[in-house]
Curated annotation (Swiss-Prot):
Its cofactor is Mg(2+). Its main location: nucleus. The active site is at residue 178. Residues 1-14 have a biased composition (Basic residues). Serine/threonine-protein kinase that mediates both meiotic and mitotic chromosome segregation. Required for histone H3 'Ser-10' phosphorylation. Phosphorylates mei-S332 within residues 124-126 and stabilizes its association with centromeres during meiosis. May regulate the function of the ESCRT-III complex core component shrb during abscission of germline cells in oogenesis. The keyword Cell membrane does not apply. It comes from Drosophila melanogaster (Fruit fly). It catalyses: L-seryl-[protein] + ATP = O-phospho-L-seryl-[protein] + ADP + H(+); L-threonyl-[protein] + ATP = O-phospho-L-threonyl-[protein] + ADP + H(+). GO terms for biological process: chromatin organization; chromosome condensation; female germ-line stem cell asymmetric division; meiotic cell cycle; midbody abscission; mitotic chromosome condensation; mitotic cytokinesis; mitotic sister chromatid biorientation. GO terms for cellular component: centrosome; chromosome passenger complex; chromosome, centromeric region; condensed chromosome, centromeric region; cytoplasm; kinetochore; meiotic spindle midzone; midbody. This is Aurora kinase B.
Amino acid sequence: MTLSRAKHANRNHLPHLLAKVPEEHQEPIKNMCLKMMSHDAYGQPYDWSPRDFEMGAHLGRGKFGRVYLARERHSHYLVAMKVMFKEELRKGCVQRQVLREIEIQSRLKHPHILRLLTWFHDESRIYLALEIASEGELFKHLRGAPNHRFDEPRSAKYTYQVANALNYCHLNNVIHRDLKPENILLTSTDDLKLADFGWSAHTPNNKRRTLCGTLDYLPPEMVDGNSYDDSVDQWCLGILCYEFVVGCPPFESNSTESTYSKIRRMEISYPSHLSKGCKELIGGLLRKESKGRITLVDVMTHYWVKAGMAERELQLQKRERGKENTARN
């Protein structure tokens, strides 16, 4: 897919942005959509450009991109603008990854998937206008937590939300393939947004062989060079849940070969502080045989997840009451 073709395909997608958008944001997004549509109606397709946005504070950076707070000049709608230099993408041989990310993420609309609102490019840069997740990478919060781990109620809630997002992806024939805390963002309401679809794949036939993702999260079938299906995401969810409650991935080692060996031998140890339900869920996801892994629906309905979500809600309510009492005093 060329940049131009992807851009026009994405523009046809914009009127559907209002679906599941919070009411207070519907009018600004509608204005953005109408602005594009009105130009198209007169036979002059409107191309977004940096001139349409006021660029603000620097929010962060990745290997190939920098993210800024930006405001659309007409509607004043705030976005997180990811800016990537084409030359850096070319040198890193990741042009196809970026196009795949744009093509797939622009079509996914789910409350726990970071929304790609639109995109455009100029001679030297590519711009992705993304939904804002104000609390940033989940990895930062995990590293900042006591003992670098979350408690079980918080972990259960986050596991549910990621499972929900992945289930939606699979229903749309998309495998994420690079699940990890760095690729998940957190909102001010303690909700997760799955992001970074650079390694994702649209798989109607549901079979792949590409080795990709993050070393500590690789499933046995990838390590052994075998074909795989969307159940690799279940494996990665098991690793993620383990990292939530323990503070590190289960197969982490000081070398690639050692990590591969641990994955092949399924060397998993569970600390004594983990509950029976937590270990049961992780064990159901981390099965060497992909067909034996529990489904994402099984995850969402698991008793440990449901109980943890309820307890997390009570934690958040208590925290809000504490803030209100502090404000009064």
